[in-house]
A protein has these predicted regions:
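Hydrophobic alpha-helical transmembrane segments
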Residues: 1-73, 89-96, 103-244
Length: 244
């Protein structure tokens, strides 16, 4: 269970016994648990939203997204903000990309991007029918599976913890989790069967635009995938087959 504990420690703020010393190899092994962590965090988000939904759907959505951000420690939002700042600042000066990406301060592009992503999540969560909340854990699991795929298939652009473990991720786990999540999506939320397309599209964009990935690119990909899938389900809720 060391791998699961490390995955929870790395991806969430949940109070679990920590793993004090670990290597990139340990982190790569723990990656097999990332989608399960997504299912766990997504279940808590869905429960928070469900608990308040009977009073006010907008309030429930806001509290659900707040729980979402708190549980993950805004880890992936930080990566999204860093990537947005780097892309914005290097629009006219490409050589500035990595310098801005490594800057710990959040700039205008990062703030605006975070605000828009959070607003989109709140709006989409508020639109979901109450019985469609079962799709939220699947969305978070798909997004974390994306980190395994991008880390495995894309070359690292710089040396960092998020980059070093990528090539060591066991490819078999990607296949296993893809089959599990496709089966669950087909049974509960058919629109989520498009998740592999979203994951592949983000990977293709990173390859074409940057030539590879960094840890921030993985975090940004989680946010993009979550937001895209949540919007997809919210806008196609008539296609849901979730049993009542």
């Amino acid at each position: 269970m060391r791998g699961l504990r490390l995955a929870l420690q790395f991806l969430t703020r949940l109070p679990v016994p920590g793993v004090e010393a670990f290597s990139s190899v340990d982190l790569a092994r723990s990656a097999a648990w990332f989608p399960l962590v997504g299912l766990l965090v997504g279940s808590i988000v869905a429960l928070v939203t469900f608990a308040v939904d009977h009073r006010s759907a907008p309030l429930a959505a806001i509290l659900g997204v707040l729980a979402w951000v708190w549980l993950t420690g805004a880890l992936h939002l930080d990566g999204l903000a860093d990537l947005a700042d780097a892309l914005g600042a290097s629009h006219r000066e490409p050589q500035r990309f990595f310098a801005v990406l490594s800057d710990p301060h959040v700039g205008t592009f990062g703030v605006v991007t975070i605000v828009f992503v959070l607003l989109l999540k709140v709006a989409a969560l508020a639109l979901l029918p109450i019985d469609a909340l079962l799709c939220v854990p699947l969305i978070l699991a798909w997004a974390r599976l994306g980190t395994l795929a991008w880390g495995r298939w894309l070359p690292a652009l710089k040396a960092g913890q998020g980059e070093r473990f990528g090539w060591q991720i066991p490819g078999g786990w990607i296949v296993v989790w893809t089959m599990i999540l496709l089966g669950a999506s087909a049974a509960l939320a058919p629109p989520l069967c498009a998740a592999p397309v979203v994951i592949a599209a983000w990977g293709a964009w990173l390859k074409a635009r940057l030539g590879g990935m960094t840890g921030d690119c993985l975090g940004a990909g989680v946010e993009v995938t979550e937001t895209a899938l949540l919007l997809l389900v919210a806008l196609t809720s008539g296609a849901m087959t979730i049993p009542r």
